[in-house]
UniProtKB/Swiss-Prot annotation:
GO terms for cellular component: cytoplasmic microtubule; cytosol; membrane; microtubule cytoskeleton; nucleoplasm. The modification Phosphoserine is found at residues 91, 157, 171, 187, 208, 247, 262, 331, 480, 496, 499, 514, 520, 523, 528, 535, 555, 594, 611, 707, 717-718, 724, 734. The modification Phosphothreonine is found at T159, T485, T532, T696. Residues 1-20, 116-136, 149-306, 320-639 are annotated as: Disordered. Its main location: cytoplasm. This is G2 and S phase-expressed protein 1. Phosphorylated in mitosis. It is found in: Cytoplasm, Cytoskeleton. CDD domains: GTSE1_CTD. May be involved in p53-induced cell cycle arrest in G2/M phase by interfering with microtubule rearrangements that are required to enter mitosis. Overexpression delays G2/M phase progression. The keyword Cytoplasm applies. PANTHER family: DIFFERENTIAL DISPLAY AND ACTIVATED BY P53 DDA3 /G2 S PHASE EXPRESSED 1 (PTHR21584), G2 AND S PHASE-EXPRESSED PROTEIN 1 (PTHR21584:SF10).
Length: 739
């Protein structure tokens, strides 16, 4: 059998082994061993066993055999294998076959040895690096894991946690406590100056409540003047206010003594005069204490705290930047220090009052400073009047309007009037009265009364005032009594642009405050403190620049515009029709003023009618006649003066009488701009501002030539007006129009 022949090979090899050398014997043995080993895996019957075994791919068994051959272990294994195989029948090999088998055996043995050695070396090498690499990898991973664990331990460590917590807790906790003491320190400082008068109000629960808002106002002023106290004071204002209201009486005993006087002032003007004399002396030391840190800051706080209600409303309506600018400008260190010193010493106050009077004529900013003190005490207006007759007279006219409203509301103007002359006579008393105003709501009522007196006194002066623009504020006088305090607050923003408007608005809220003394007084106080300086500056400026004057005129008109509501708007539209040029030039200004008030159009036409820029001579004449009538009218009821003013303005608009009658009710702010179309027909209101501009030359014969320039101005202001073409209220509410 083949198998037998195959098995004869080892026998032949053995026979040859006897003749062969030892190495050959080893080779033969190796072959035999391998053959037998492979017989285990392969069938013994296959004749090509050797070929199959050795030429096939090397498996795990072959590698193991190669390793054993290298170790010379196959020698002992060989005898058992042949012994085990001995029972099989072996056929003898022929000589040729034996030689062939021998050669093949050697070749196979060499091949197997070489391959086995290479494989063994390769297997040994990769095993070592693999094991080493695995170990290294494990070590590295352990190190990395240890690092992570260490980091976790560091994070979890109580020290690290404590550090983090302390840092977080320290930054916020330390900040607020520091701010609180600052607020506390600031709160005593404030009550020492302006809160003393507030304490005088504190005896009554409503007065204490008002004192708190006033303190908030003072905090606003302090924040504007000094950024250090801004956040703390704003956040802690309610607490500080409550604490101040409680602790201030203990802190300032003098104001407590004044407390009984404060209600009496609010009730009786004569008592107010006596209290004014008393208050200036006490607030003066408070003011002196505050100026030590910053005279203008302390007194600025005084001025701010008085009008809480109106001041808050003003802050809402007016841009914070504008209010801050007003407060900063109005509360100039030197001027307020002078006021405080004047409070301390009436003689010095007199000298300084004369200085203030001279200042308004010279520059607008001193007027603004005076305006603060003047609002504090209308007497300032009177001393300022001789120094600057034009600005002072216009400003007085504004206050005259306010005073007329106050006279209508309050019956005590005569009693207040003597106090006013007394204050101007003694500059110190006047400054003291201003300080008292900043300190107490009583001063607010007195302010309204003084404004009435100043109105009575300044009415005569206003009548001679040549500038129609300043006379226009009388319109606002008529309107202000009817208009509600919120309307005044609305008008106050545009009045910021126009000093006269602001003055009238501030005065009107004071009169209204006479009804609800505490709230209105607080609001009036803030109003007088912040906006007045800007308005007085404007009053000083208008004579120098007529353009600013129409703005000032427009703002007072804005107050009556509210009262007139739709009717004044229509009237104003009729008036503005003939004067498109001036109207559009001032449209941007009017738009600025209008957003604050529901009926800005009436203000706009008035300001335009009185503005020197008007191209129509008829308008200037009509405005002069209207101003004269208005001067005569303000003595009477303010409302009739408004109606007359509207009628007078309609007369200059006689160029288009048909439209005048129709749009009185229908014309909104856009209609106001559309007044030329209104002349054509009431249905033309729907036309856009641009269409109106194009139509204006046709409608307004007098304005036809400058109409292109007016068109440009309207184009700039048209988008703001177009926001709410149908209703003026919408324009007022629109954010773009608001300042």
């Amino acid at each position: 059998m083949e198998g037998g022949g195959g098995r004869d090979e080892p026998s032949a090899c053995r026979a040859g082994d006897v003749n062969m050398d030892d190495p050959k014997k080893e080779d033969i043995l190796l072959l035999a061993d391998e053959k037998f080993d492979f017989d285990l895996s392969l069938s013994s019957s296959s004749a090509n066993e050797d070929d199959e075994v050795f030429f096939g791919p090397f498996g795990h068994k072959e590698r193991c055999i190669a390793a054993s051959l290298e170790l010379n272990n196959p020698v002992p294994e060989q005898p058992p294998l042949p012994t085990s195989e001995s029972p099989f029948a072996w056929s003898p090999l022929a000589g040729e076959k034996f030689v062939e088998v021998y050669k093949e055996a050697h070749l196979l043995a060499l091949h197997i040895e070489s391959s086995s050695r290479n494989q063994a070396a390769q297997a040994a090498k990769p095993e070592d690096p693999r094991s080493q690499g695995v170990e290294r990898f494990i070590q590295e991973s352990k190190l990395k894991i240890n690092l992570f664990e260490k980091e976790k331990e560091m994070k979890k460590s109580p020290t690290s946690l404590k550090r983090e917590t302390y840092y977080l807790s320290d930054s916020p906790l330390l900040g607020p406590p520091v701010g609180e003491p600052r607020l506390l320190a600031s709160s005593p400082a404030l009550p020492s100056s302006g809160a003393q008068a507030r304490l005088t109000r504190a005896p009554g629960p409503p007065h204490s409540a008002h004192a708190l808002p006033r303190e908030s106002c003072t905090a606003h002023a302090a924040s504007q003047a000094a950024t250090q106290r801004k956040p703390g004071t704003k956040l802690l204002l309610p607490r500080a206010a409550s604490v101040r209201g409680r602790s201030i009486p203990g802190a300032a005993e003098k104001p407590k003594k004044e407390i009984p006087a404060s209600p009496s002032r609010t009730k009786i003007p004569a008592e107010k005069e006596s209290h004014r004399d008393v208050l200036p002396d006490k607030p003066a030391p408070g003011a002196v204490n505050v100026p030590a840190a910053g005279s203008h800051l302390g007194q600025g706080k005084r001025a701010i705290p008085v009008p809480n209600k109106l001041g808050l409303k003003k802050t809402l309506l007016k841009a914070p930047g504008s209010t801050s600018n007003l407060a900063r400008k109005s509360s100039s260190g030197p001027v307020w220090s002078g006021a405080s010193s004047a409070c301390t010493s009436p003689a010095v106050g007199k000298a300084k009052s004369s200085e203030f009077a001279s200042i308004p004529a010279n520059s607008s900013r001193p007027l603004s400073n005076i305006s603060k003190s003047g609002r504090m005490g209308p007497a300032m207006l009177r001393p300022a009047l001789p120094a600057g007759p034009v600005g002072a007279s216009s400003w007085q006219a504004k206050r005259v309007d306010v005073s007329e409203l106050a006279a209508e509301q309050l019956t005590a103007p005569p009693s207040a009037s003597p106090t006013q002359p007394q204050t101007p006579e003694g500059g110190g008393q006047w400054l003291n009265s201003s300080c008292a105003w900043s300190e107490s709501s009583q001063l607010n009522k007195t302010r309204s009364i003084r404004r009435r007196d100043s109105c009575l006194n300044s009415k005569t002066k206003v009548m001679p005032t040549p500038t129609n623009q300043f006379k226009i504020p009388k319109f606002s006088i008529g309107d202000s009594p009817d208009s509600s305090t919120p309307k005044l607050s609305r008008a106050q923003r545009p009045q910021s642009c126009t000093s006269v408007g602001r003055v009238t608005v501030h005065s009107t809220p004071v009169r209204r405050s006479s009804g609800p003394a505490p709230q209105s007084l607080l609001s009036a106080w803030r109003v007088s403190a912040l906006p007045t300086p800007a308005s007085r500056r404007c009053s000083g400026l208008p004579p120098m620049t007529p353009k600013t004057m129409p703005r000032a005129v427009g703002s007072p008109l804005c107050v009556p515009a509210r009262r007139r509501s739709s009717e004044p708007r229509k009237n104003s539209a009729m008036r503005t029709e003939p004067t498109r040029e001036s109207n559009r030039k001032t449209d941007s200004r009017l738009v600025d003023v209008s957003p604050d008030r529901g009926s800005p159009p009436s203000r706009v036409p008035q300001a335009l009618n009185f503005s020197p820029e008007e191209s129509d001579s008829t308008f200037s004449k009509s405005t002069a006649t209207e101003v004269a009538r208005e001067e005569a009218k303000p003595g009477g009821d303010a409302a009739p003066s408004e109606a007359l003013l509207v009628d007078i303005k309609l007369e200059p608009l006689a160029v288009t009488p048909d439209a005048a009658s129709q749009p009185l009710i229908d014309l909104p702010l856009i209609d106001f701009c559309d007044t030329p179309e209104a002349h054509v027909a009431v249905g033309s209101e729907s036309r856009p501002l641009i269409d109106l501009m194009t139509n204006t030359p046709d409608m307004n014969k007098n304005v036809a030539k400058p109409s292109p320039v007016v068109g440009q101005l309207i184009d700039l202001s048209s988008p703001l007006i177009q926001l709410s073409p149908e209703a003026d209220k919408e324009n007022v509410d629109s954010p773009l129009l608001k300042f």
